[in-house]
Amino acid sequence: MYTYLMLTMRTEKFNQEHVAGHYEFLDRLQAEKRLKMFGPFSDATGGAYVIEADSLEEAAEIGHADPLVASGSSELTIKEWKLKK
């Protein structure tokens, strides 16, 4: 498993109605033990979450299933994160 930082930044099309679905999406990732941490940015421009996945392709598939991203409300950037322990 690899660790990925998932950055979701609001777009001009941001719609608050998709936020509840976003949190349900994160709850599912947490139940699957993939989600390590998450939270919004203090300036309300978006947020980030950290997941574990087998590949960048799998991380992208997961990230594009996020209702905020799928709706166009947020733009997704994914970075593999080589955490030091």
UniProtKB/Swiss-Prot annotation:
Pfam families: YCII (PF03795). Belongs to the YciI family. This is Uncharacterized protein YjpA. It comes from Bacillus subtilis (strain 168). The lineage of its organism: Bacteria, Bacillati, Bacillota, Bacilli, Bacillales. The gene is yjpA.
